[in-house]
């Protein structure tokens, strides 16, 4: 590298995004982070700061509002060598081949190393199992989508760049299907759709909330069972905003049991994390083009809670 903080261009990837005619005047960093699920907003901001983004041929600021019809050019640098450590952490591998891997992530496991979590993450475990995984730099995480630390369930991993592009395209086109199970307080209608924009909570920037100027977000749910004051839901994401299911269900008035951020302060159920599990994942295989489906049963801690509720109901 030619200097500290700079990115050496070896085999850079060029991308072009045309702002759609219906797009509102949103900040360019937020717009690009939403348009490209494989890049976080912080990564987009870094690209902008280092001159790897052009807006109608000029270098923008991160706060630049986008306009319909504008052309945005991005240069995605190659992976940055990191100090990531491969750790032989056991993984529940639901499926693997030369192109993808599907992992059943346990609750409590962080997906990416971050300040405070340099070890013991899913990425550390993946590097031990797949030494050739294209995951080396922060701009190429290799992981197509994320789950919160205390959400369990299915994640798909791209084992090379071609698979990554295919899976990201499926996410952007909303062809990838993700279904969760959530236990909530209250009894919602049997089916419903929550169509409400999500953004940073203006009262607490560490939380997300339904806000008028947020990014479009849509969640579908179906009632599976009821246990007194509690309901088990099947939840399907149409979009993938941060904390979307947790925020939307709280907004609807049915917070997730055990959610330390968006749930009730007290619960009579002894659960150390939110009752949210990614139970189903459907996608088109990047190489074969065939539709594949994967499932993961509820983990033991969530099954215990359901049995407790079933036992209570049988006594009344």
UniProtKB/Swiss-Prot annotation:
The keyword Repeat does not apply. Keywords: Isomerase, RNA-binding. It is an enzyme of class 5 (isomerase). It comes from the Bacteria. One of its GO terms (molecular function) is rRNA pseudouridine synthase activity. PROSITE patterns: PSI_RLU (PS01129), S4 (PS50889). Its EC number is 5.4.99.-. SUPFAM superfamilies: Alpha-L RNA-binding motif, Pseudouridine synthase. CDD domains: PseudoU_synth_RluA_like (cd02869), S4 (cd00165). It holds the Pfam family S4. The keyword RNA-binding applies. It catalyses: a uridine in RNA = a pseudouridine in RNA. GO terms for biological process: enzyme-directed rRNA pseudouridine synthesis. Residues 26-98 form the S4 RNA-binding domain. The active site is at 148. Gene3D superfamilies: Pseudouridine synthase (3.30.2350.10), RNA-binding S4 domain (3.10.290.10). Belongs to the pseudouridine synthase RluA family. This is Uncharacterized RNA pseudouridine synthase Caur_0901.
